[in-house]
Amino acid sequence: MYGQTVAVRQVDLEVVDPLYCCLLGPSGCGKTSLLRMIAGHEEISSGAVLIDGHDVSVLAPAARPTSMMFQNYALFPHLTVLDNVAFALKIKGLGKAERHDQAFTMLQNVQLRDLAGGYPNQLSGGQQQRVALARALITQPKILLLDEPLSALDPFLRIEMRAELKELQRRLGITFIHVTHSQDEAMALADLVLVMNDGVVEQTGSPMEIFNKPRNAFVANFIGGHNVITIGPKIYAVREDRIRITPMGDSQIGAIEFMGANVRIKVSDGAGGSLTISQTDREFAKLKLALGDQVGVSWQKKDQLELTA
């Protein structure tokens, strides 16, 4: 809680095997607060945090088998890359030779061994992130906590780094819990996704489960790729790629977005409603659609997924 504001409510998360877990949601939904509670940087007002069956709720962050990689990396500018990575081992009292040996090994894991003698201001953003990642992993935590680690990177590097994170998690065999507001990031990285909103977990599942069977209108809208449609008293989700366009009809094309292999088309029905339709570039080329065209839209009943409110 922050004053009278409840940051996270009734969260029940169980991670059984080492996997990549993403906490996904809009700004202010409670995902970073939940991450900080696991790390011990925020107190919990009720419930417990258990790791390997042991309650760590009362333990200080340094006493928990977790390590946290912060959004701003928080590297020490006056220390070399090697000493940044080895810093936690120095605090634990390890000798210089031993901690440097372990730090070299960790830098090898993140492909930065050749830059061990450099300083943070000599590194690119992606290299700084790798240093922060190596520093977080040097203590051999059971759980690595990542607070929006890719948000400061350009789109190309972000895609490259998320592949490296996933491969590293598999190789190390530990659980990564990763906070993000990017749907694409969560879908690409996660074995398990928690979709959060206003301090509550709206849905938990694999990326495929979340996308194919969103539980409610919030999840369908936030994950994207769906139209949320009201038919009588019920609410349905229909995937954008399940809607078909035919020439001539009561709807009008209001926007066309070319996205490489796919094209997104927004159509309005003249009564204030709109639908977004996704087609392959080949489908779009065959129909020869243009802004302002009158078209018909349809979908099969089996492609309607009923939602809770």
Residue ranges and their predicted role:
Residues I235-A309:
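Non-catalytic connector elements of ABC transporters
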Residues T32-L35, V131:
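ABC ATPase nucleotide-binding domain helices that frame the ATP-binding cleft
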